[in-house]
From Swiss-Prot:
It catalyses: 3-methyl-2-oxobutanoate + acetyl-CoA + H2O = (2S)-2-isopropylmalate + CoA + H(+). This is 2-isopropylmalate synthase. Belongs to the alpha-IPM synthase/homocitrate synthase family. LeuA type 1 subfamily. It is found in: Cytoplasm. The gene is leuA. Its EC number is 2.3.3.13. One of its GO terms (molecular function) is 2-isopropylmalate synthase activity. Mn(2+) binds at D14, H202, H204, N238. Residues 5-268 form the Pyruvate carboxyltransferase domain. It comes from Aquifex aeolicus (strain VF5). It is an enzyme of class 2 (transferase). The keyword Cytoplasm applies. Its main location: cytoplasm. Residues 394-520 are annotated as: Regulatory domain.
Length: 520
């Protein structure tokens, strides 16, 4: 057996800090269960001290998700560490991840602390965290812009006082692979007792080099990689888990006997679940999980793949769970056929949940002849991944008049926090008129940042999936809606995004106060 590279997934912490990617507690829980199926080693469930919402999410995940180590981020402050420890109490296996900046620019302008004061803070934070768990990770924020000798001292201090994992973040995505690899090698050669801990890396993608830097670090001695599904994260994002894991698996000729315990057959499903939850879909040419990742249009390429797959493909689509067959269900399909297909897609439900899904499936099958996998995924999302049981805005009814040489007009009746309201409006089209009527009824006008709609499946009776990104008082949120009627799909997407913005507004403002002080 070779050497293991630990996969530390921070989708639910660093990943969801990106604008438009915030998740509710229930959504985080859905993702955490799937990450456990993916078999990542560590799930960073959130930043428990950031807000009540973050605390609840970390606590629920610690209580309900089994398998991976559950981790919470905490600044190098006793108050943060105590809150993280409290949130993690139910976890079978837990880790506290504490951090402080070590670069001159951060120490002088953000922390307003001397290097000696920072070292003292590291000592106290790591020692205090060890009172709650034997698994403590310490991160040197902005490590790649830190003075080398001071970085060594900071790491040595953390190890001396009980850190079990040392993380080297390229916080601003500044590093180039060759120099980042050299940094890891220098740390391995110059820090006493570095062999007693796991050396970790956390790379941002500002220069498009996060995956390359992470892999170079592994080659030079790092044995934990912090990454996110689809590479999501602040600014340009993080190293993509799927890219790091598959590079190590496919290029064993280069990386030797290094391996991960990730169940790669769950990669595609995990990627799709994140897309559904956040409403942000990966670009078609995204490595490993994009729609075109295993598509071939060139005649020469098609001929080669048909002759022998490995002529133009370096991995099997099945290795990442990429669906190669499309099973079509219809109105004559029974409960057993539906249950079997859902299980093949990786979904498992109780009898009561399956009854709900089957009822919705039959309604959908009556409206369209053929029900594809994409339809089933959308149906499950609509039924089981709503943002809240109580939504602030509920559209009760709407009617639209539109046609050739007519001004599109919409009338909407809705409920806002229990109060019924009604309004009418005209617009540049039926969707525009309906959205304006909703805004008029609510008395608010969020800024629409993006709107798109696409057919999920072939044929004119296909379900449409609408996606909306909006901003309400500085809070960005995305929503999606699915229906065979494109106006209904658009209304669902708009109200979904609006509800998310309303629910998250205070939550995000609270967390912003913490985030301004820095994260890795």
């Amino acid at each position: 057996m070779g050497e293991k590279v630990y996969i530390f997934d921070t989708t639910l912490r660093d990943g969801e800090q990106a604008p438009g990617f915030s998740m509710t507690t229930e959504e985080k829980l859905q993702m955490a269960h799937q990450l456990a199926k993916l078999n990542v080693d560590i799930i960073e469930a959130g930043f428990a001290a950031a807000s009540k919402g973050d605390f609840e999410a970390v606590n629920r995940i610690a209580k309900e998700v089994k398998g991976p180590v559950i981790c919470s981020l905490a600044r190098a402050l006793e108050s943060d560490i105590e809150i993280a420890a409290k949130a993690l109490e139910p976890a079978e296996r837990k880790r506290i991840h504490t951090f402080i900046a070590t670069s001159p620019i951060h120490m002088e302008y953000k922390l307003r602390m001397t290097p000696d004061q920072v070292l003292e803070r590291i000592k106290k934070a790591v020692s205090f965290a060890r009172n709650f768990t034997d698994d403590v990770e310490f991160s040197c924020e902005d490590a790649t812009r830190s003075e080398r000798e001071f970085l060594y001292r900071a790491i040595e201090t953390a190890i001396k006082h009980g850190a079990t994992v040392i993380n080297i973040p390229d916080t601003v995505g500044y590093a180039i692979p060759e120099e980042f690899g050299q940094l890891i090698e220098d740390i391995m050669n110059n820090v006493p007792n570095i062999d007693k801990v796991i050396l970790s890396v956390h790379c941002h993608d500002d220069l498009g080099l996060a995956t390359a830097n992470s892999l170079t670090a592994v080659k030079h001695g790092a044995r934990q990689v912090e990454c996110t599904i689809n590479g999501i994260g602040e600014r340009a994002g993080n190293a993509a888990l799927e890219e790091v894991v598959m590079a190590l698996k496919v290029r064993k000729d280069f990386f030797g006997d290094l391996y991960t315990d990730v169940n790669t057959k769950e990669i595609y499903k995990t990627s799709r679940l994140l897309c559904r939850i956040t409403g942000n879909f990966v670009q078609p040419n995204k490595a490993i999980v994009g729609d075109n990742a295993f598509a071939h249009e060139s005649g020469i390429h098609q001929h080669g793949v048909l002759s022998h797959r490995m002529t133009y493909e370096i991995m099997n689509p099945e290795d990442v769970g990429f669906p190669m067959s499309r099973i079509v269900l219809g109105k004559h399909s029974g409960r057993h056929a539906l249950k079997r297909r859902l299980e093949e897609l990786g979904f498992k439900f109780t009898k009561e949940e399956l009854d709900r899904i089957f009822e919705k499936f039959k309604e959908l099958a009556d409206r369209k002849k053929e029900v594809y996998d994409e339809d089933l995924e959308a149906l499950i999302y609509q039924e089981f991944m709503k943002i809240e049981d109580h939504e602030p805005v509920k559209v009760l009814h709407f009617q639209v008049q539109s046609g050739d040489n007519m001004i599109p007009t919409a009338t909407v009746k809705l409920e806002f926090k229990g109060e019924e309201r009604e309004a009418s409006s005209t617009g540049n089209g039926p969707v525009d008129a309906t959205i304006k009527a909703i805004q008029k009824a609510l008395g608010i006008e969020p800024k629409l940042l993006d709107y798109s709609i696409k057919a999920l499946t072939p044929n004119t009776d296909a379900q449409a999936e609408a996606r909306v990104v909006l901003e309400l008082d500085g809070v960005k949120a995305s929503g999606r809606g699915v229906d065979t009627d494109i106006i209904k799909a658009s209304v669902k997407a708009f109200t979904d995004a609006l509800n998310r913005a309303i629910v998250r507004k205070e939550y995000i403002i609270q967390r912003q106060e913490i985030r301004e002080e820095g994260t890795v």
